[in-house]
Amino acid sequence: MEKKPWEEDISIEEFKKSLNKDKITNLIIKRRWNKGKSTYHLSFNGDFEVVTKKPSTKYVTHKQLDQKLKEFKQDLMVELHDTFATKADLRDSEARINQKLEALVQVVLLHGEQINKLTQIVEKQGEQIRELQVEQKAQRQEFNARMDRLENLLVESIESTNKRFDSIEGRLDSMDSRLDSMENRLDSIEGRLDSVEGRLDSVEGRLDSMENRLDSMETRLDKIDPPK
């Protein structure tokens, strides 16, 4: 299981104990003589952790940073004084250390400002993302409402179309029945016309017979009583 990063404040003694660990690989303290004066130079290097910004990360103020650096310098000067030389011998080294620490402070402050700017950018982007999420949610709700309305319209349209189809189908059935009735009536009329035609033919035959009889009677009358 991966260990979570952590940090803590350490004293000079704890700093000395950590020299044999992996974080600090080399610590050099040099004493130099020049024209009867001695100076001490402190340098160290190694692999250090990279601090990343987390939601719970808290930045120290300039005042707190100055106080921490002041305490560190005081502890370092006391340790060097007790170990190597008097205060008079450490003035030059103290000045150099102060310069290095001041440069380190400037670097830390610069990175702190950059981190603060990046944090503001991230927070602003987070607000924009939240606004976009709210807008997206509203658009999704509006889209769902439109889809519901469209679905209802489609259902109503389909139901209305089905009703119209049912009505048309009923009317078609009624028209079919009426056509069947009319067809039956036409068949009946046609039968009646055929019967009338037959009767007319019979009447015509009888008329022809009567006409022949009249002609015969007229001929007989002419024989009996010839015209003068």
From Swiss-Prot:
SUPFAM superfamilies: MPN010-like, Tropomyosin. Gene3D superfamilies: 1.20.5.170, 6.10.250.40. InterPro entries: DUF16. Pfam families: DUF16. Disulfide bonds: none annotated. Signal peptide: none annotated. Belongs to the UPF0134 family. This is UPF0134 protein MPN_137.
